[in-house]
């Protein structure tokens, strides 16, 4: 008779765990993740070299939130898992114009790498490659032109891209900072874009 309550608690605990797992899976499915780069690293110890794998992962929700992370482990899957977890903890929110492109052109740099991001009209697509494309795809950007100079290191390219994205602001933020109306900011932006298209 004394074992019955314990058995019931174990059963209820098992049911709770089974009920929790689908919700955690749903949370994971909300994010898109892309493996940008993976390489083997070595640590020199007294007994020789100890090898491990380092992974660089980009995670986004397809609606303007994006983050990147790095992970290191003896096995590739574990390194990717660590990088993915770190990326989810360090996500930033980037305002998108019409849910498809950036509000304005922006620049960023890290180390020797310089990145230029330009907003683009509908139908342009993602004109960028390598690590930068992974950032745009997971973030939900559909039209953008990106260029990176000075480095081919994927880590520096990702950090320079995020430095540029952090500087991206919505018209409402710019208007609040300058003490102007949102309509004036949008009209000036659209006028500059039209002038650039005719040149």
UniProtKB/Swiss-Prot annotation:
State the oligomer form and interacting partners: Part of the 30S ribosomal subunit. Contacts proteins S4 and S8.
Please list where the region (Disordered) is annotated.
Answer: 1-28
Q: Which Gene3D superfamilies match?
A: 3.30.160.20, 3.30.230.10
- Function comment: With S4 and S12 plays an important role in translational accuracy. Located at the back of the 30S subunit body where it stabilizes the conformation of the head with respect to the body.
Q: What name does this protein carry?
A: Small ribosomal subunit protein uS5
- The organism encoding this protein is Rhodospirillum rubrum (strain ATCC 11170 / ATH 1.1.1 / DSM 467 / LMG 4362 / NCIMB 8255 / S1)
Q: Does the keyword Methyltransferase apply?
A: no
Query: Which controlled-vocabulary keywords does the entry list?
Result: Ribonucleoprotein, Ribosomal protein, RNA-binding, rRNA-binding
Q: Name one GO biological process term.
A: translation
Offer a single GO CC term for the protein: small ribosomal subunit
* Swiss-Prot/TrEMBL domain comment: The N-terminal domain interacts with the head of the 30S subunit; the C-terminal domain interacts with the body and contacts protein S4. The interaction surface between S4 and S5 is involved in control of translational fidelity.
What PROSITE patterns does the database record attribute to this sequence? Answer: RIBOSOMAL_S5, S5_DSRBD
| NCBIfam families xref list | rpsE_bact
The family assignment reads:
Belongs to the universal ribosomal protein uS5 family.
Domain S5 DRBM, chain residue ranges per copy = 31-94
One GO MF term, please?
structural constituent of ribosome
Under the heading HAMAP family, the entry gives: Ribosomal_uS5_B
């Amino acid at each position: 008779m004394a074992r019955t309550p314990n058995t019931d608690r174990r059963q209820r605990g098992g049911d709770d765990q089974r009920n929790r797992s689908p919700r955690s899976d749903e949370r994971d499915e909300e994010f898109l993740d892309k493996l940008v780069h993976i390489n083997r690293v070595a640590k020199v110890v007294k007994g020789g070299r100890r090898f491990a794998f380092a992974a660089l992962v980009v995670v986004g929700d397809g609606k303007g939130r994006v983050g990147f992370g790095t992970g290191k482990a003896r096995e590739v899957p574990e390194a990717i898992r660590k990088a993915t977890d770190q990326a989810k903890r360090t996500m930033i929110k980037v305002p998108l114009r019409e849910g498809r492109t950036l509000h304005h052109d922006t620049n960023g740099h890290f180390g020797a790498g310089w990145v230029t991001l330009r907003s683009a009209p509908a139908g342009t697509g993602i004109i960028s490659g390598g690590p930068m494309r992974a950032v745009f795809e997971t973030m939900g950007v559909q039209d953008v032109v990106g260029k990176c100079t000075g480095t081919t290191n994927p880590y520096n390219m990702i950090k320079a891209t995020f430095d540029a994205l952090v500087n991206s602001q919505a018209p409402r933020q710019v208007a609040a900072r300058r003490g102007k109306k949102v309509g004036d900011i949008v009209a000036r932006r659209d006028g500059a874009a039209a002038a650039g298209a005719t040149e």
